Regions:
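Short, charged low-complexity linear segments at domain edges
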Residues: 1-18, 74-89
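Short Cys/His-centered divalent metal-binding micro-motifs
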Residues: 35-42, 103-126
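A detector for short metal-coordination/catalytic motifs
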Residues: 101-102, 119-142
């Protein structure tokens, strides 16, 4: 995920190198949660299951092999494709904690799922701040 401009000062100067080290050296260019490979087009079903071209099998959202699922060529109407892009995520959502044990290489899907609680928290704070402004000024704040 892109770093917000007002959060850039929280990251170290060598963030690009640190991020690349986590994504490509430690994780080997694969998502550390589901195992999707960086830079490849991946067939998936939208619920976390994806086709692992190398293994010739379906995998679930945790990277485990899935049994009893037909090959993707027989399920074309249900499959979608996505280009996988790895990003480095902070496990504790604290951008100042750049210890290697706190960083994870995640694909878009896993990153969004990992950040879900943090996004909901920020959304609630934004809602409350806007509602507080509504108490000060007239307007459609309902």
């Amino acid at each position: 995920m892109p770093i917000r401009r007002h959060h850039r000062w929280l990251h170290p100067i060598d963030w690009r190198e640190l991020s690349a080290s986590i994504r490509f050296r430690r994780a080997g260019g694969r998502c550390e949660t589901c195992g999707r490979p960086h830079g490849r087009m991946v067939l998936h079903l939208g619920d976390g299951r994806w086709w692992d071209e190398e293994a010739g099998r379906w995998r679930d959202g945790a990277g485990r092999l899935v049994r009893r699922l037909r090959p993707p060529h027989s399920m074309l109407e249900r499959t979608r494709t996505t280009r996988v892009v790895l990003a480095t995520a902070h496990r504790d959502h604290d951008p100042t904690n750049n210890d290697a044990s706190n960083l994870a290489a995640l694909c878009q899907r896993c990153h969004i799922l990992h950040d879900k609680s943090e996004h909901l928290r920020r959304r609630r704070l934004t809602y409350l701040a806007r509602r507080a402004l509504g108490d000060l000024f007239t307007g459609p704040y309902g």
